[in-house]
Amino acid sequence: MTDHREVVVVRWRGQTASVEDGLAALLTAYHLRTEAEKGEAVAEASDLPDRYRAEITDPWTAFADDAVLVAFQGDTAVGCLVVTSPSEGRSEIKRLWTDPGFRGRGVASALLGAAFAHAAENGAETVRLSVWEWRSDAVALYERLGFTVTESWEERKQLVSMQRAV
């Protein structure tokens, strides 16, 4: 198992093509997998709903008010996460994805640690997220990192809402 210290997390600012290319691939994989798990499989990114395609093709605009974090092992983008700007003392974590070939190597933990630090530095007292109930490995990771299930703010069924202090 690779130690998570080998993972480097950077905040994506739209400044380099290599990071952007890696981010687009990660977001594409995230959305295609999520749609398939929801029973709404699509063959390629161009078949995704407009709002998801916009995140892939123009993340600078889609996440204009948010921090986009990208994890690297060497020169390879292996994970991503979006953390929203704090509102009412709370930030939300979205789009956490680790390339399946790099899972179990601390990538998600490194991204979440960077997200917690970013949220705290920007005035958040808590972070929250929602996760599909069938993603039991993700739910277990969040629980290990101190998240607890809370009342849902989501209207979509099968989403588990969780939060923790930063």
For the regions a language model picked out, list residue spans one by one:
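Glycine-rich ATP-binding loop(s) of histidine-kinase-like ATPases
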Residues: 103
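Conserved G/P- and acidic residue-centered "switch" motifs that form tight phosphate/ATP-binding loops
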Residues: 106
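Acetyl-CoA-dependent GNAT
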Residues: 4-94, 99-100, 112-114, 118, ...
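C-terminal "cap" of GNAT-fold acetyltransferases
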Residues: 2-10, 125-166
